């Protein structure tokens, strides 16, 4: 907070006391901060670090502490209205704060939906809309903060989507693509559909690409997805295009051209659009963020260092659904696993300091010496990561087919071939005549 010299401005000391806008002058990013005192449980910031660190503070809240420094009055008083919010100190918990306005009626209402710790009951997520309607009848000033409502909606959608996937039959998958899907591929597609945002880390050769395409097609069939953005290495752009066209018959657009031309192409109507990592990174310097229905990231191991420009760019693509593909075993380096997991669920393994302390062993120099508690970690990631090896699904795979393709040589290759053939013929003749080859000949 001291180093970045953040700018602090009050929203409205009379109408919204204790609420501030904190601006980072370098990035021009603005954050909403609620400050009720140095160690108040009611402090809040809209930044990513506050939501995931579980510390109850961040550099923007610390900037408020520096700004006040005992010289200005801190608005410690809480609003009179009741509100539903997310407590980020132990993961994410939806809670209610009961204000002084009509407090007894709100306490009675809360008993039906919240537990003794004022946390939303698991069974109440499905009926949260009923609670909101009753709460607004009690007090027009009642608030449900956007992040809390979004989380409730997310939980409900996950439940509804899981029920839909469980009801899918084999005929739904048989008609999905212009090819037959193997049982393990259907399993991977169902996994990705249920998760919403997932990592498919199958061994190379098991058809991760086709699983991602089939997942997108099933979501499009359900009208949950309208457009899909595929991010991949430059060398794979047209391979993705051919595969999508071959298996779906849908229109595919490869985003190319100069910076301004590419930025316009994100608004196209094609169901599938493809962009390279480097182009996306450059485009987001101008666009700041991109909104898509579904995101597919191929060769995600290239994003293992989350401080690179490309990795940061991938995190600025906002998508309702995502499938991340990796052909390398992420469990070999837990630091990379943590980085990739942030692309599908920023809260799954965070905060990093707790993750590192729990699962990574360091030597006296601070370097990684080994890992621990891996069974526990496996349980944590199995809701969003699936990995199969060829030996695991060997019985489901077709028999190996070998095809010989004869390709004519180019002129340059023919010249090199003829030179090599001449040298070989000389050596053969010498051997047939003398039955001896010198060391120079043998090399």
Segments predicted by a language model, with ranges:
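Hydrophobic, aromatic-enriched, well-ordered structural segments
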Residues: 1-42, 67
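P-loop (Walker A) phosphate-binding loop of NTP-binding proteins
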Residues: 192, 203, 328
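Charged, low-complexity
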Residues: 12-14, 72-198, 224, 242, ...
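Conserved P-loop NTPase motor "coupling/switch" region that bridges the ATPase
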Residues: 221-227, 242, 246-249, 268-269, ...
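Conserved SF1/SF2 helicase motif Ia
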Residues: 199-206, 211-242, 321
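Conserved helicase motor
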Residues: 254-262, 277-282, 302-308
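Inter-lobe connector of SF1/SF2 helicase motors
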Residues: 364, 390-443
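Short Cys/His-based metal-binding microdomains
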Residues: 28-79
């Amino acid at each position: 907070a001291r180093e970045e010299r953040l700018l602090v401005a009050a929203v409205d000391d009379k109408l919204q006391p204790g609420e501030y806008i904190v601006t980072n002058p370098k990035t021009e990013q603005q954050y909403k901060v609620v400050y009720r005192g140095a160690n108040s449980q009611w402090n809040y910031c809209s930044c990513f670090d506050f939501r995931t660190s579980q510390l109850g503070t961040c550099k923007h809240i610390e900037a408020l502490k520096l700004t006040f420094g005992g010289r200005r009055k801190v608005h410690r008083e809480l609003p009179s209205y009741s509100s539903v919010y997310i407590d980020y100190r132990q993961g994410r918990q939806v809670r209610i704060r009961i204000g002084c306005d009509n407090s007894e009626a709100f306490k009675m209402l809360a008993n039906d939906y919240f537990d003794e710790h004022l946390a939303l009951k698991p069974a109440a997520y499905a009926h949260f809309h009923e609670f909101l309607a009753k709460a607004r009848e009690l007090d027009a000033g009642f608030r449900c903060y956007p992040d809390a409502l979004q989380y409730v909606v997310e939980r409900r959608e996950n439940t509804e989507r899981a029920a839909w996937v469980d009801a899918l039959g084999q005929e739904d998958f048989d008609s999905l693509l212009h090819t037959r899907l193997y049982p393990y591929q259907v399993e991977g597609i169902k996994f990705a559909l249920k998760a919403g945002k997932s990592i498919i880390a199958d061994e190379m050769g098991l058809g991760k690409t086709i699983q991602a395409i089939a997942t997108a097609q099933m979501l499009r069939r359900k009208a949950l997805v309208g457009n899909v953005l595929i991010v991949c290495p430059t060398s794979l752009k047209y391979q993705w295009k051919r595969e999508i066209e071959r298996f779906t018959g849908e229109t595919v657009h490869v985003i190319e051209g100069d910076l301004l031309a590419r930025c316009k192409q994100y608004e196209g109507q094609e169901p599938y659009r493809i962009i390279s990592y480097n182009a996306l990174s450059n485009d987001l310097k101008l666009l700041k963020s991109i909104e898509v229905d579904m995101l597919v990231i191929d060769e995600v191991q290239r994003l293992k260092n989350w401080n690179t420009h490309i990795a940061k760019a991938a995190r600025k693509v906002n998508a309702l659904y995502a499938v991340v593909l990796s052909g390398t075993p992420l469990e070999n380096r837990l630091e990379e696993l943590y980085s990739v997991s942030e692309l599908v669920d920023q809260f799954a393994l965070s905060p990093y300091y707790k993750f590192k302390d729990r699962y990574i062993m360091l030597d006296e120099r601070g370097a990684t010496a080994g890992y621990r508690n891996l069974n526990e970690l496996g349980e944590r990631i199995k809701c969003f990561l699936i990995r199969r090896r060829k030996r695991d699904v060997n019985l489901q795979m077709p028999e190996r087919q070998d095809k010989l393709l004869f390709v004519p040589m180019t002129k340059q290759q023919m010249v090199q071939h003829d030179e090599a053939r001449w040298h070989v013929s000389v050596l053969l003749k010498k051997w047939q005549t003398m039955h001896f080859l010198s060391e120079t000949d043998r090399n």
